[in-house]
Amino acid sequence: MIGRLRGIILEKQPPLLLLEINGIGYEIAIPMNNFSLLPAIGQETILYTHCIVREDTELLFGFIKKPDMILFRALIKINGVGPKLALAILAGMSEKQFLSAIEHNEIHMLTKLPGVGKKTAERLVIEMKDKLKGTSKSLFSLATIGEGLAKTEIEAITALISLGYTHQEASKMVKKVAIEGANCETLIRDALRTTL
């Protein structure tokens, strides 16, 4: 699976982005609110990605922030929520607002999102609560305490959370091995070694 891409922006035609990597143009669907965060055409960008392969097509979805990708993956596992609706949800409210709406059973907030009716909102609350028991607070924490950490440390913590560790466990593991200039892969590998 393609998990991350770095390339030059060739075209922006919301909701699609054309990214050139080694002479190949990748068409990537991204949340509408991510377009304002992208650099100009001709500039380089990095996207976290999720690839869906179907019988008749291959779809690539991109996200500027890794927690958005994690939330997207959780959303598309819910019955009745496809990739397009998941993108609309991510574009309609911030990750923090969405997780708060789930945590506090705010059905009325969710029904304001395009394509989300009352039944879908209720299903989101029920199913997402179970999926996010260990990660909702973790994702909140990453959004609020990220300022004090290097980008690679935040990415490593997010990756460890997606592997099933709590935010507290992941933070401790990364802090034990964090050194200036280390890349994300090194931090993750070294952090996982601390558990052996």
Swiss-Prot record:
InterPro entries registered for this protein in UniProt: DNA_helicase_Holl-junc_RuvA_I, Hlx-hairpin-Hlx_DNA-bd_motif, NA-bd_OB-fold, RuvA, RuvA_2-like, RuvA_C, RuvA_C_sf
Transmembrane portions of the chain: none
Statement: the UniProt record of this protein carries the keyword Metal-binding: no
SUPFAM superfamilies, alphabetized: DNA helicase RuvA subunit, C-terminal domain, Nucleic acid-binding proteins, RuvA domain 2-like
Gene Ontology MF annotations: ATP binding; four-way junction DNA binding; four-way junction helicase activity
Region of interest: Domain III: 154-196
GO cellular component: cytoplasm; Holliday junction helicase complex; Holliday junction resolvase complex
UniProt entry tagged with the keyword NAD: no
Entries under CDD domains matching the protein: UBA_RuvA_C
Annotated region (Domain II), positions in chain: 65-143
Primary localization class, coarse: cytoplasm
Keywords: Cytoplasm, DNA damage, DNA recombination, DNA repair, DNA-binding
GO biological process entries: DNA recombination; DNA repair
Region Flexible linker: start-end pairs: 144-154
Superkingdom to which the source organism belongs: Bacteria
Location of this chain's protein in the cell: Cytoplasm
Domain comment in the entry: Has three domains with a flexible linker between the domains II and III and assumes an 'L' shape. Domain III is highly mobile and contacts RuvB.
HAMAP family for this protein: DNA_HJ_migration_RuvA (MF_00031)
Quaternary data: Homotetramer. Forms an RuvA(8)-RuvB(12)-Holliday junction (HJ) complex. HJ DNA is sandwiched between 2 RuvA tetramers; dsDNA enters through RuvA and exits via RuvB. An RuvB hexamer assembles on each DNA strand where it exits the tetramer. Each RuvB hexamer is contacted by two RuvA subunits (via domain III) on 2 adjacent RuvB subunits; this complex drives branch migration. In the full resolvosome a probable DNA-RuvA(4)-RuvB(12)-RuvC(2) complex forms which resolves the HJ.
Family label: Belongs to the RuvA family.
Name of the protein in its database record: Holliday junction branch migration complex subunit RuvA
Species for this entry: Baumannia cicadellinicola subsp. Homalodisca coagulata
Gene transcribed to yield this protein: ruvA
